[in-house]
Amino acid sequence: MVRRFRGESHHKVDTKGRVSIPASFRRVLESSDPNWTPGDAPELVIVYGDHRRNYLECYTMEAIEEVDKKIDALPRGSMERKMLQRLFHGQSYPTNVDETGRLVLPAKLRQKIDLEGEAFFIAAGDTFQVWKPETYEAEELAKTEEWLDELPEDFDPLVFLDGAKGE
């Protein structure tokens, strides 16, 4: 089963907030939605609540279920559980991909990340992110370049995976 999103792409956003999802991302959404059958629209959940994040985080149904199980395992009434419920349940938007492969992003979500005209999609493992292209370039691309610049020229970042759990 395909579980990982890979790649990045730019897509136009129309005035109603409709934006095409990369085709490869749609395949992952389909395979990670236990209720999906061919001809149906795959579901996903867009989490937008963290004010420190200038992007929308899009979860497959399987990925958000994993998050929900971890939240449910926390003690009832604990501050951590309350805050995580607020972020992942309350400040989230369940939706689906329409028959033409598009998402409809409500005005509230577009306003949160100042999105108009064009969206930048980037894979993040079992989620993907939607950014305003200029924000991504200014914030994330700069961080990655700075991080790489601090490493020796011949350094292979895969060395960080040596000794990773689950080998």
Where do the PLM segments sit?
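Flexible "stalk/tail and boundary" regions
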Residues: M1-H11, T15, F25-T95, E99-T100, ...
